[in-house]
């Protein structure tokens, strides 16, 4: 049995090494992106529920429209978001430049320049995310809502039971861009029972990485893949295009890098990259204009869910907490969510003036 486990482990190791070698032999956008997605994105299927913090208006909108809003990461609470990852990449590049051969310098200088351009212009203008926390009753989160209090909605967005051809099956939730759904998918609903979403709109939950050593390890690996590709003469076009291919993957990866000071949040994110095809909406918050994408919660075939995947509703500490809870329960009753009334509960953190 132990030999079988050892053999299986070695096979997995060899497969990963083969995958990396394959990327080096053909370092294109797709191979790099697949490598990053399979190796470095931590898919979260064991954390149930995942909590989304919002205010009372946000709660009612989510429940009425069965959608969440993905906000442009440029306007989130960590001002250094994504920038720290680019600065770390530049630090690694400078270390490589001390020992690399001339053949590799063009790639490294090009990478450094692109990273600097992103830093100067704002690295995150095309990246949107929806944030969740592992903990639904965090004082640091409630503080952001002040005396008005907030609400955390506990979602189970991993798997759900469905039926296919009369048999029970497991489905995966899908966040669908409402604009894409209304302009592309909705027209096909009557003609086709299976409506796969565009890969850009289909995302899985990813854990945020707070440890700088882990962030460095990931960036070092991607830069080293580029160097190896140059060294072996595997560049498809030129060094600049290779850098752009790597940066495409980093657009998804860098939003999972956060400063260790935010580690208490234990944040989990859905991440999208806007390629110009999405409809961007705008809203006001704290005297700022926030760009966002409307994301419907659907099943993996883009069909409406019979049961909305909410498992817990926590009302944050506030002066009129009992009245808020009563109002939420009545709202749920009047909007077809009777099965969620017993899920509403107060925060265990006491309210203080």
Regions found by a protein language model. Give the residues of each.
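Partner-binding and oligomerization surfaces adjacent to conserved cores of proteins
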Residues: 2-353
């Amino acid at each position: 049995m132990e030999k079988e486990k050892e053999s299986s482990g070695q096979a997995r190791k060899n497969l990963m090494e083969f995958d990396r070698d394959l990327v080096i032999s053909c370092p294109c956008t797709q191979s790099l992106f697949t490598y990053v997605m399979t190796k470095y994105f931590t898919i979260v299927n064991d954390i149930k529920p995942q909590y989304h913090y919002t205010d009372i208006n946000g709660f009612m909108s989510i429940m009425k429209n069965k959608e969440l809003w993905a906000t442009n990461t440029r306007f989130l609470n960590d001002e250094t978001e994504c920038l720290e990852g680019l600065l770390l990449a530049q630090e690694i590049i400078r270390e490589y430049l001390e020992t690399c051969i001339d053949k590799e310098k063009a790639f490294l200088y090009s990478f450094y320049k692109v990273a600097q351009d992103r830093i100067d212009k704002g690295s995150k203008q095309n990246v949107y995310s929806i944030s969740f926390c592992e903990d639904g009753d965090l004082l640091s989160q409630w503080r952001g809502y002040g005396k008005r209090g907030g609400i955390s909605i506990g979602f189970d967005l991993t798997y759900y039971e469905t039926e296919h051809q009369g048999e029970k099956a497991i489905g995966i939730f899908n966040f669908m861009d409402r604009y894409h759904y209304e302009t592309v998918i909705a027209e096909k609903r009557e003609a086709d029972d299976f409506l796969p979403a565009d890969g850009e709109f289909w995302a899985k939950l990813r854990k945020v990485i707070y440890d700088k050593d882990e962030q460095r390890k990931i960036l070092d690996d991607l830069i080293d893949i580029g160097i190896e590709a140059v060294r072996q003469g595997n560049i498809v076009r030129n060094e600049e295009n290779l850098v752009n291919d790597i940066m495409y993957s980093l657009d998804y990866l860098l939003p999972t890098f956060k400063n260790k000071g935010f580690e208490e949040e234990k944040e989990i994110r859905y991440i999208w990259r806007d390629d110009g095809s999405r409809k961007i909406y705008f809203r006001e918050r704290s005297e700022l204009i926030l760009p966002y994408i409307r994301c419907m919660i659907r099943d993996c075939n883009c069909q409406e869910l019979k049961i909305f995947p909410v498992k817990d509703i926590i009302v944050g500490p506030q002066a009129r907490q009992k009245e808020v809870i009563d109002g939420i329960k009545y709202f749920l009753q009047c909007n077809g969510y009777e099965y969620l009334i017993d899920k509403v509960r107060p925060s265990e953190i006491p309210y203080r003036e």
